[in-house]
Amino acid sequence: MANGHRSQIKRERNAVKDTRPSAKLSYARVSVQKACFVLDAIRGKSLDEALAIVMYNPRYASSIIEKLLKSAAANAENNNGMDPSKLYVEECYANKGPTMKRVHPRAQGRAYRIEKRMSHITVVLNER
């Protein structure tokens, strides 16, 4: 058990809280592997460059990540008072979410399983 009063513990926990602007999408209906193709392309890029990359990327995940980038940029501007022209993608990752299991009927009464995978996508921005 931690020593100290509950309010003191909360104060200490909030002191080390990450204040970088971010956006997170949970339960995105795209697999982690497919989302990572787009995320790898924008990692470390400036915000304008990252938005240009996802805008012209034909993958389905890029439309989801474009919304996330715009949301994180709005969070940076409105909540943190950061300049949008100085922002860059510091972190972006996709974690595994739950899997929906579906059945695909096959010949002679068999059934194959289809796994519809989900992911939790996070984008973290910062100022240069």
From Swiss-Prot:
Keyword Coiled coil attributed: no
Keywords: Ribonucleoprotein, Ribosomal protein, RNA-binding, rRNA-binding
Span list, region Disordered: 1-20
Molecular-function GO terms, alphabetical: rRNA binding; structural constituent of ribosome
Gene Ontology CC entries for this record: cytosolic large ribosomal subunit
UniProt-listed InterPro entries: Ribosomal_uL22 (IPR001063), Ribosomal_uL22_bac/chlpt-type (IPR005727), Ribosomal_uL22_bac/org-type (IPR047867), Ribosomal_uL22_CS (IPR018260), Ribosomal_uL22_sf (IPR036394)
Ranges of biased composition (kind: Basic and acidic residues): 9-20
GO terms under biological process: translation
Function: This protein binds specifically to 23S rRNA; its binding is stimulated by other ribosomal proteins, e.g. L4, L17, and L20. It is important during the early stages of 50S assembly. It makes multiple contacts with different domains of the 23S rRNA in the assembled 50S subunit and ribosome.
Similarity annotation: Belongs to the universal ribosomal protein uL22 family.
PANTHER family: CHLOROPLAST 50S RIBOSOMAL PROTEIN L22-RELATED (PTHR13501), LARGE RIBOSOMAL SUBUNIT PROTEIN UL22M (PTHR13501:SF8)
Oligomeric and partner information: Part of the 50S ribosomal subunit.
Protein's name in the database: Large ribosomal subunit protein uL22
